[in-house]
Amino acid sequence: MKFFVLFLCLVQLWGCHSTPVVLGLEERNPACDDPETEAAALAGVDYLNQHVRWGYKHVLNQIDKVRVWPRRPSGEVYELEFDTLETTCHALDITPLANCSVRTVTQHAVEGDCDMHVLKQDGQFSVVFAKCESTPDSREDVRKVCPQCPLLTPVNNTKVVHAANAALAAFNAQNNGSHFELLEISRAQLVPLPVSTYVEFAVVATDCAAADGTDPACSGPPKKQYGFCKATVAEKLGGEEVSVTCTVFPTQPVAPLPQPDAASSANPPPAADPAVSPPSSPSVPVDSVALGPKRVLLPPPVHREHYNLRYSFPDVDSASGEAFGPRQKPKVTHPGVASGVGPVPPPPCPGRIRHFKI
């Protein structure tokens, strides 16, 4: 009897090994311009823009690499490398990304470089790992295209800080509504001719009227209405001329900032730039991940020409157990049977350039 039971076990074991290989359990290398690859990359760009706390929104420019891994028990993960370009829409602007203009080379463009892992499950995309950096175009390349165009200058430059404060004071003097205070200086350029300072900055409304802006109590939270200003402060004999235009965004309810795989986190309003914020304003807490080791989202450095995308994400992976680092492959069981005869040439990558390359 024992021999018969053992024989049945061996038969079942042999049957398991002789089962045909199930397709779809191996790594795939789709084309960078494949519609599904682009959909995964666009999901990554949306995730990026949801987490940008300073500076500007970004758009997809080019997909450099893609690998697709199966994920047990279901779904698959797109391992992506793609480039982005900075737009003229501020991170707090509610304008749809499709309506945002890409910053041109003559405006000193900024390029982003992202590594993301995007999970596709039940037809839905979600980001499980994200890492991005961004750099402005080189000064030499800008000069080749436009020798006289002004270049980016550090936002803590004394002329830049003065221009932002002077422009904000002029806006508050003309504004009959709420008093606004400086939230961040987003970018700046020193213009040689005519001698002037161009600055773009974000503002936030206080609970006081513009006429009462000098009252210390006017700095109290909550601050739910933001605006974005563009200003030029021209140097004149015996003084200066200030030109400023501000767009005030509709009041938005404070919503929780999404995290990969629905990991919960606190969501305070964007933190003010410590280099330009009023001394009396309270420090704003930054995001912290609720699960696992506590790691915070560090503010960008004070001396900078742009807001690097590296400060958009906390230094932590997804709270999901399926998340993995940028160079760590997910655990995959590869079949023991060859899937094809001979080496298969990789599909075309990188993909097309949607705007321009810098």
Curated annotation (Swiss-Prot):
Localization: Secreted
Signal peptide: 1-18
Modified-residue entries (Phosphoserine), positions: 134, 138, 318, 320
Keyword Lyase: no
CDD domains assigned to the protein according to its UniProt record, in alphabetical order: CY (cd00042)
Recorded family membership: Belongs to the fetuin family.
Disulfide feature: 32-349, 89-100, 114-132, 146-149, 208-218, 229-246
Glycosylation sites (chain numbering): 99, 156, 176
Record's protein name: Alpha-2-HS-glycoprotein
